[in-house]
From Swiss-Prot:
The enzyme's E.C. designation: 6.3.2.6
Protein name per UniProt: Phosphoribosylaminoimidazole-succinocarboxamide synthase
Keywords: ATP-binding, Ligase, Nucleotide-binding, Purine biosynthesis
A Pfam family: SAICAR_synt
Gene Ontology terms for molecular function: ATP binding; phosphoribosylaminoimidazolesuccinocarboxamide synthase activity
Gene Ontology terms: biological process: 'de novo' IMP biosynthetic process; cobalamin biosynthetic process
Highest taxon, organism lineage: Bacteria
Catalysed reaction equations from the record: 5-amino-1-(5-phospho-D-ribosyl)imidazole-4-carboxylate + L-aspartate + ATP = (2S)-2-[5-amino-1-(5-phospho-beta-D-ribosyl)imidazole-4-carboxamido]succinate + ADP + phosphate + 2 H(+)
Organism lineage string: Bacteria, Bacillati, Bacillota, Bacilli, Lactobacillales
Enzyme class: ligase
Source organism of this protein record: Streptococcus equi subsp. zooepidemicus (strain MGCS10565)
Gene from which the chain derives: purC
InterPro entries for this protein: SAICAR_synt/ADE2_N (IPR028923), SAICAR_synt_PurC (IPR033934), SAICAR_synth (IPR001636), SAICAR_synthetase (IPR050089), SAICAR_synthetase_CS (IPR018236)
Family annotation (Gene3D superfamilies): ATP-grasp fold, B domain, Phosphorylase Kinase, domain 1
ATP-binding recorded as keyword: yes
Pathways per UniProt: Purine metabolism; IMP biosynthesis via de novo pathway; 5-amino-1-(5-phospho-D-ribosyl)imidazole-4-carboxamide from 5-amino-1-(5-phospho-D-ribosyl)imidazole-4-carboxylate: step 1/2
């Protein structure tokens, strides 16, 4: 690959292209947990995440959500708009699970009365602390108007994807989003949407996401392949 590497992350590498407003994203087979403290290579995982994320972002583009996604290039690569990421992880929860259940003593699997949005400061050295709007303002991560827009878009994305996943027998338990500014200064959805950064349960309650790896529940790629097959079948 002749493109110059800009950034190497836990799950993706980012490369320059001839257009300074566009980057090439290459998905890795690496899977991590505990904020990258534990790593493994699982063959085929990068390809599955790339294809799932491309499918979902294409859908979101078509329903009017502004995203960084341009097109899928290969099984492991896609073109995206270059984005200056806001260092915030925006988590939306529909069902109690994971850290939410532990933090608030809520039984895993309990449906929430309304979707709940949580904000986390994206900072590996601080272990991505849980913060609120006032912290965001103090740290000058985003303006009040930008946070309001991010939350509005997150709820809109949730409403659409929750219905789409339900139509293929999957419950969208929770997910993490990242937003940033493109070359023109527009605030758009970025990063990825895959079973690496969301929780999906099938109608039998089986995990179809990275919890398969975290909890050693079976084959991660088999779970991801099932998600891709179901979404692809409905998209045709």
């Amino acid at each position: 690959m002749s493109n110059q590497l800009i950034y190497s992350g836990k799950a993706k590498d980012i490369y320059e292209t001839a257009d300074d407003g566009i980057v090439l994203i290459s998905y890795k087979d690496q899977v991590t947990m505990l904020n990258g403290a534990h790593k493994e290579m699982i063959e085929g995982k990068g390809s599955l995440n790339n294809q799932i994320s491309a499918l979902i972002f294409d859908r979101l583009n078509r329903v009017g959500v502004s995203t960084h996604f341009i097109k899928q290039l290969s099984e492991t690569e896609q073109l995206n708009k270059r984005v200056a990421i806001i260092p915030l992880e925006v988590v939306l929860r529909n069902v109690a699970a994971g850290s939410f259940s532990k933090r608030f003593g809520v039984k895993e699997g309990q449906a929430l009365d309304e979707p709940i949005i949580e904000l986390y400061y994206k900072n590996d050295a601080l272990d991505d602390p849980f913060i609120n709007d006032e912290h965001v303002s103090f740290l000058k991560l985003a303006t009040d108007e930008q946070i309001a827009y991010i939350k509005q878009e997150t709820h809109r994305i949730n409403a659409y994807l929750k219905e789409w996943f339900a139509s293929v027998g999957l419950t969208l338990v929770d997910f993490k989003l990242e937003f940033g500014f493109d070359k023109e200064g527009m605030l758009i959805l970025a990063d990825e949407f895959s079973p690496d950064n969301c929780r999906l349960w099938d109608n039998a309650g089986r995990h179809m996401d990275k919890d398969v790896f975290r909890r050693q529940l079976g084959s991660l790629t088999q779970a991801y392949e099932t998600v891709l097959e179901r979404l692809r079948a409905l998209d045709q």
